[in-house]
Amino acid sequence: MKIGRQSKIVELISKHNIETQEELADLLVKAGYRVTQATISRDIRELKLTKVATDNGKQKYIVLTNQESGMSEKYIRILRDGFVSMDMAQNIIIVKTVSGMAMAVAAALDALHIEGIVGCIAGDDTIMCAIRTVPDTISVMEKLSKLINGNK
């Protein structure tokens, strides 16, 4: 049952731009599966699904390959370990880090390929992230907050 459901989830995600757990649950119900929000949440975690930005500014679930998932987790851990605070100035995000961690955190940000970040410059405890537009800056800050707080 679980294997079949999770296979169906992967299939649905590859065919549809699914933004929320509710959308995924609705599609699973239409496909004949009885699911709860807790089941969906557990499946998302076990399948290592993540959200990425689409071209129209929305988000969708995708399945990371094992290599991408493992590396992504390492970069997120570096981000969490080094992060102190962040603030925005127009289309620039200033990230404060633990002393000596700015280079590692900036490299992690670059490696995560977060939509909207043009590039990062790091000092000892401060990173300047250039963002494409002001609205993108707000979106990137939200994504970073989710990553840092454990909500991919």
Swiss-Prot record:
Its main location: cytoplasm. This is Arginine repressor. Regulates arginine biosynthesis genes. Keywords: Amino-acid biosynthesis, Arginine biosynthesis, Cytoplasm, DNA-binding, Repressor, Transcription, Transcription regulation. GO terms for molecular function: arginine binding; DNA binding; DNA-binding transcription factor activity. The keyword Repeat does not apply. Belongs to the ArgR family. InterPro entries: Arg_repress, Arg_repress_C, Arg_repress_C_sf, Arg_repress_DNA-bd, WH-like_DNA-bd_sf, WH_DNA-bd_sf. It comes from Lachnoclostridium phytofermentans (strain ATCC 700394 / DSM 18823 / ISDg).
